[in-house]
């Protein structure tokens, strides 16, 4: 075979007739060897109709030799003359001037001209591909629904494992691809710790009823209805994909070409070869429409299965099998025929064992339109990956051709209409428990009994007894031994004389604070006292000075655990809260009062520590010593006690503007207590910043925390109109939205790990012997009475904070008067 365009001609393909070998120059010769054959025995075949008859000259040449390649024959050495055999043909591509080429004889087994033209059109269409066209097709894929996997650029389709490993280069890079070893499943490829890792996305099918099912995806813990939802959760929350690897994904690797191009590039298109698959994946490739059943059955095996390339065209009542027959104008249909009744004879895709299908009709003509469904209210969820790329017959309403079984005609459990909350007008066959309709005879016997027990049924429901579910999920898959049981209204009987201990008690919505300063019985304070009494301040300072920093930290932890309801929570309190710990209660709507109490104690504690520092009217060394003792207590709370709540209160006091402006006091601390000053600057301040930026889970092990950081969460949920401290420092950060999300995620973890915090607190306070006076001065009621007096403690919170802010400013200026250049507070 000669080089050039003749190289694309296939070899050894049998046809109906054999011709003698002839040179291409014989087409221009008047003495063609083909003249010996009678042309009447070989009817002409042409893609544009019949060739013009030859009036004079040599016998006509078959169109398969002269016109099948559409002007691809080479020039002769002499200037080519227009032949009467080819003058009416349309050249689709200008011919180059080939000179000096030598031509060999043709293969006697020539391809049918119609099929050869289709193959030539495919190859030419591929050669005409431009980056603009690919970009446009990629944009069309990305504009699909967000729940469609193809609309996400991080989905790369059927690419090999090695290729995906080469795409992820940095820690956090990830992409999703089809599993080549397990068709129908998906794999997440990412890089973590400079190592490419592959995680199979587990696919679980939940049976909602006999005829319907739902697909969910998960890695280890939480499951999702779609893969995009799964990826959004793990990327947004920076959640490790697995506990063993700890891999975190946050940087998607996006594809730059359409999915079909990736499959053809790496040769991973399922069920077809490399040569023909490149064009079959394109929607605008010219294809011949055959109206014969035999031709389509031969072509049916080449249809792609298992990919997501063409699902976007299968909608409505348009037959999906016509996706592979694009050139509809090529077929001549009669007036009474429509495209929906073309005898395409496509086979149904293989169904999963859990879904029953009816056999495909033998007739090549069948209905492809929509059919009404029995359950219009039920949203059928079919994952795009389970049936992707398969030729579907008719619209999506025929994916489950077998309807659910009809109920028994005897309404053996039918009761008169009632306003029961579980009755719903949208109930359908899927809501029926199959165990109900074991036999119609049994149902007929129970009919009269059920009608008589209707009043008892309503009474039982008011008492909290459960009836038949009206939800889309059949929980029988979770009830291993109770699958055969069904709800019997006659069995719902309760003794009015006996009280059910397991009866649900609604939680109590608390409206009054647990801090009652005027009802507080104190051994140190009189029944009525004035704000900031000197004798009380001096006695409290002596107690604070005489005790060790660790002992003070233990007392603070003990009081904090009682206020936050971590320790000493009675059963009655648990029943009224609805939960077992205050750490879970503060995340719930009816925990508002506890959140306000936590804010009150935190602010009161911070103000009391500031007063302890600013109330030292003695020498500069005394103030530095008090500051040193407070920093030591903060270190004990952080390292030994794990009480991050009181730790944040101390750090808040030390970072108040009235304290930070005391330059002489901080200088004296550096001179006399150098090690303490270094610990404060190098450890405590950076650690406090990490806590308020929501990164404590990275630097603080959960096993060492007794009381977590509560203030960011309760502040977000109970923001006051006027706060003592103004906005928190993390709210002034450029990444405040991400920090807020991190605090909310930490709150969820707090509620889940409340039992772990309780055990840690009990372990730390195992050998603790409390001192009554030290415990009293650390209680919130005592501090409120000491700071605002017996009358002022009952005043509005915002008013109290605003007035005390002015008092602290005055005390600070009295200790160290501002210079002329110093800006006023």
Curated annotation (Swiss-Prot):
Taxonomy, superkingdom:
Eukaryota
Q: Which residue range or ranges hold the Ras-GEF domain?
A: 548-818
* PTM summary: Phosphorylated on tyrosine residues.
Where do the segments described as Disordered lie? 40-84, 300-320
UniProt xrefs under SUPFAM superfamilies: Ras GEF (SSF48366), SH2 domain (SSF55550)
In terms of one coarse class, where is the protein primarily found?
cytoplasm
Mind telling me which residues the site (Required for interaction with NEDD9) is annotated on?
748
Presence of the UniProt keyword Acetylation in the record = yes
Listed under GO biological process in this entry are:
endothelin receptor signaling pathway; epidermal growth factor receptor signaling pathway; insulin receptor signaling pathway; lens morphogenesis in camera-type eye; positive regulation of cell population proliferation; positive regulation of GTPase activity; positive regulation of MAPK cascade; small GTPase-mediated signal transduction
> What residues bear N-acetylalanine in this entry?
2
| UniProt keyword annotations, A-Z | Acetylation, Cell junction, Cytoplasm, Guanine-nucleotide releasing factor, Methylation, Phosphoprotein, SH2 domain
Q: Which InterPro entries match?
A: Ras_GEF_dom_sf (IPR023578), RASGEF_cat_dom (IPR001895), RASGEF_cat_dom_sf (IPR036964), SH2 (IPR000980), SH2-Ras-GEF_adapter (IPR051853), SH2_dom_sf (IPR036860), SH2_SHEP1/BCAR3/NSP1 (IPR044102)
For the modification Omega-N-methylarginine, the affected residues are: 442
| Boundaries of every SH2 domain copy | 154-253
User: How does it associate, per the subunit comment?
Assistant: Part of a complex comprised of PTPRA, BCAR1, BCAR3 and SRC; the formation of the complex is dependent on integrin mediated-tyrosine phosphorylation of PTPRA. Within the complex, interacts (via SH2 domain) with PTPRA (when phosphorylated on 'Tyr-792'). Interacts (via Ras-GEF domain) with BCAR1. Interacts (via Ras-GEF domain) with NEDD9. Interacts with PTK2/FAK1. Interacts with PTPN1. Interacts (via SH2 domain) with EGFR (when tyrosine-phosphorylated).
Its name, as the record gives it, is Breast cancer anti-estrogen resistance protein 3 homolog
């Amino acid at each position: 075979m000669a080089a050039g365009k003749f190289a694309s001609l296939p070899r050894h393909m049998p046809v109906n007739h054999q011709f003698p070998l002839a040179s291409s120059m014989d087409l221009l010769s008047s003495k063609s060897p083909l003249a010996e054959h009678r042309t009447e025995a070989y009817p002409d075949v042409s893609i544009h109709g019949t060739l013009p008859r030859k009036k004079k000259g040599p016998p006509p040449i078959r169109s398969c030799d002269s016109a099948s390649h559409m002007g691809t024959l080479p020039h002769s050495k002499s200037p080519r003359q227009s032949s009467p055999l080819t003058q009416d043909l349309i050249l689709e591509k200008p011919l180059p001037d080939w000179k000096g080429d030598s031509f060999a004889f043709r293969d006697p087994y020539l391809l049918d001209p119609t099929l050869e033209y289709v193959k030539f059109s495919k190859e030419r269409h591929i050669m005409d591909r431009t980056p603009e066209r690919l970009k446009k097709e990629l944009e069309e894929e990305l504009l699909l629904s967000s729940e469609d996997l193809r609309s996400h650029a991080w989905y790369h389709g059927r690419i090999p494992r090695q290729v995906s490993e080469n795409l992820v280069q940095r820690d956090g890079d990830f992409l999703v691809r089809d599993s080549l070893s397990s068709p129908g499943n998906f794999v997440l490829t990412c890089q973590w710790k400079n190592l490419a890792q592959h995680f199979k996305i587990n696919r679980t099918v939940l049976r909602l009823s006999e005829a319907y099912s739902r697909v969910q995806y998960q890695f280890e813990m939480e499951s999702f209805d779609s893969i995009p939802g799964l990826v959004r959760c793990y990327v947004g929350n920076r959640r490790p994909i697995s506990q063993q690897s700890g891999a975190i994904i946050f940087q998607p690797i996006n594809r730059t070409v359409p999915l079909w191009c990736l499959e053809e590039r790496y040769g991973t298109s399922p069920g077809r070869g490399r040569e023909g698959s490149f064009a079959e994946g394109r929607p605008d490739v010219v294809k011949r429409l055959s109206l014969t059943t035999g031709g389509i059955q031969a072509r049916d095996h080449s249809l792609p299965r298992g990919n997501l390339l063409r699902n976007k065209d299968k909608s409505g009542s348009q037959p999906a099998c016509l996706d592979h027959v694009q050139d509809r104008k090529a077929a001549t249909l009669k007036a009474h025929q429509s495209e929906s009744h073309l005898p395409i004879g496509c086979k149904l895709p293989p169904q999963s064992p859990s879904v029953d299908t009816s056999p495909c009709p033998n007739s090549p003509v069948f209905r492809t339109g929509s059919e009404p469904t029995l359950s219009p209210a039920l949203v059928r969820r079919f994952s795009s990956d389970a049936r992707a790329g398969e030729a579907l017959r008719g619209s999506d309403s025929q994916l489950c051709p077998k309807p659910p079984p009809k109920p028994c005609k005897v309404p053996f459990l039918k009761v008169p209409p009632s306003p029961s909350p579980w009755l719903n007008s949208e109930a359908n066959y899927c809501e029926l428990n199959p165990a109900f309709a074991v036999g119609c005879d049994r149902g007929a016997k129970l009919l009269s009994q059920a009608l008589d027990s209707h009043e008892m049924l309503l009474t039982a429901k008011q008492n909290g007894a459960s009836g038949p579910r009206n939800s889309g999920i059949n929980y029988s898959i979770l009830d291993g031994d109770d699958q055969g049981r069904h709800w019997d209204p006659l069995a719902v009987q309760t003794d009015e004389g006996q009280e059910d201990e397991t009866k649900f008690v609604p939680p109590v919505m608390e409206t009054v604070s647990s801090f009652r300063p005027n009802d507080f019985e104190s051994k140190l304070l009189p029944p009525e006292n004035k704000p900031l009494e000197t004798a009380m301040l001096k006695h409290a300072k002596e107690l604070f000075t005489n005790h060790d920093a660790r002992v003070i930290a233990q007392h603070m932890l003990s009081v904090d655990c009682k206020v936050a309801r971590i320790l000493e929570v009675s059963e009655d309190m648990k029943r009224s809260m609805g939960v077992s710990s205050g750490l879970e209660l503060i995340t719930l709507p009816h925990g508002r009062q506890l959140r306000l109490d936590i804010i009150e104690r935190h602010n009161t504690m911070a103000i009391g520590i500031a007063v302890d520092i600013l109330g030292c009217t003695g020498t500069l060394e005394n103030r530095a010593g008090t500051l040193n003792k407070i920093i030591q207590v903060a270190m004990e709370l952080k390292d030994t006690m794990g009480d991050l709540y009181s730790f944040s209160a101390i750090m808040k006091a030390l970072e108040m503007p009235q304290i930070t402006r005391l330059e002489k006091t901080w200088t004296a601390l550096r001179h006399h207590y150098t090690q303490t000053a270094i610990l404060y600057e190098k450890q405590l301040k950076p650690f406090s910043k990490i806590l308020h930026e929501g990164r404590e889970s990275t630097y603080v092990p959960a096993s060492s925390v007794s009381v977590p950081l509560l203030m960011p969460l309760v502040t977000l949920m109970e923001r006051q109109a006027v706060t003592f401290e103004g906005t928190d420092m993390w709210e002034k950060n450029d990444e405040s939205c991400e920090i807020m999300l991190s605090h909310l995620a930490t709150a969820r973890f707090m509620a889940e790990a409340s039992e772990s915090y309780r055990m840690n607190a009990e372990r730390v306070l195992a050998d603790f012997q409390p001192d009554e006076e030290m415990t009293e001065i650390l209680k919130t009621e005592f501090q409120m009475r000491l700071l605002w007096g017996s009358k002022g403690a009952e005043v509005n919170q915002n008013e109290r904070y605003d007035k005390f802010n002015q008092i602290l400013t005055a005390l600070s200026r009295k200790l160290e008067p501002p210079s002329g250049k110093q800006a006023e507070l």
